[in-house]
Amino acid sequence: MPVFLSSRFLFFCIIVPLLISITLYQLDTFDPAHHPADSLISSTASIPPLINERFLTGAEFIGVGLLNSPEDIAYHEDSGFIYTGCVDGWVKRVKVAESVNDSLVEDLVNTGGRPLGIAFGIHGEVIVADAYKGLLNISGDGKKTELLTEEADGVRFKLPDAVTVADNGVLYFTDGSYKYNLHQFSFDILEGKPHGRLMSFDPTTKVTRVLLRDLYFANGVSLSPDQTHLVFCETPIRRCSKYYINGGRVELFIQGLPGYPDNIRYDGDGHYWIAMPSGVTTLWKLSMKYPFLRKITAMAAKYGYEPMFMENAGVLQVDLDGNPIAYYHDQALSHITTGVKIGNYLYCGSLWHSHILRLDLLKYPAQNKKL
């Protein structure tokens, strides 16, 4: 190749695109921050002694094609129904049978938004954290939907996420971000700044209180069995913490999770189950460590390209002190957002799948595995 051609090739095919990329990077206003140093600790810090790394081998699928992205799950013991919220706005309930083929899916009500967290009030009503509507109360077998709250301290919710209900009727819930909505949530993760809040709503006084602010994408929340504290998850920094209701003290519950926590559920038998939509991949690890990589990823997302980092999803079982007990996951699994133990089964919701997953914990137990 003549020298002048090779020089032109170098200039137009390498130097010009590089200069354009640098200019776009400098002009883009997205400004990611460094994550706290303790959020970058090894993911092996919370690996338990018992592991099932072939979740999909024994998984059964419930309501295939009828449950579009069932993000959270709540079990109503008296009726035997599982309640969930779907991406099309429907809150549905599922009567589960021994054979998944005999399971019955019913429509309850369409919120007109995106129902995420779901729980039951003390009078049997269905409480929903709707990403676009706020905190909802559904009663009368789906005939009545009431908006309970949509803002706190003058700041409107952008991403109501998870909810749990105390024995005295007080609702505790999270707002993942006051800056980004559900459609934009990846930008909140990539920005690396604490926009999340933990809140309470008292149905008697109608008062919404901010209990904690400046959380890193506040996600799942669960009440302790003695009702003294909450355990809540912060997704990007792979951490769960305790919030003591009397006094407001905060202390670490578990950190260095093997994945990015979403919902957390107490099983009534001394254990919490923490769902993780993705394990700690190399791309995730690098992006969390280096803000400039998150800025590049955010810029790409603005132009319609979002690299998929999600793999090796699963559910971690921990005891009341946050000690890891068992880990159920699969390299080929992604977007698992909740895990609820009902009897001998683990039921899992998802932001991606069109069904609920079920795993028989007796047939497919987690076993000792030397790492």
From Swiss-Prot:
One of its GO terms (cellular component) is endoplasmic reticulum. SUPFAM superfamilies: Calcium-dependent phosphotriesterase (SSF63829). One of its GO terms (biological process) is response to salicylic acid. The modification Phosphotyrosine is found at Y303. Its main location: other. It comes from the Eukaryota. Keywords: Glycoprotein, Phosphoprotein, Signal, Vacuole. It is found in: Vacuole. Glycans are attached at N101, N137. Induction: By salicylic acid (SA), jasmonic acid (MJ), ethylene (ET), wounding in local tissues, and infection with the fungal pathogen A.brassicicola and cucumber mosaic virus (CMV), both in local and systemic tissues. Residues 1-21 form the signal peptide. Pfam families: SSL_N, Str_synth. Transmembrane segments: none annotated. PANTHER family: ADIPOCYTE PLASMA MEMBRANE-ASSOCIATED PROTEIN HEMOMUCIN-RELATED, STRICTOSIDINE SYNTHASE-RELATED. Belongs to the strictosidine synthase family. This is Protein STRICTOSIDINE SYNTHASE-LIKE 6. It comes from Arabidopsis thaliana (Mouse-ear cress).
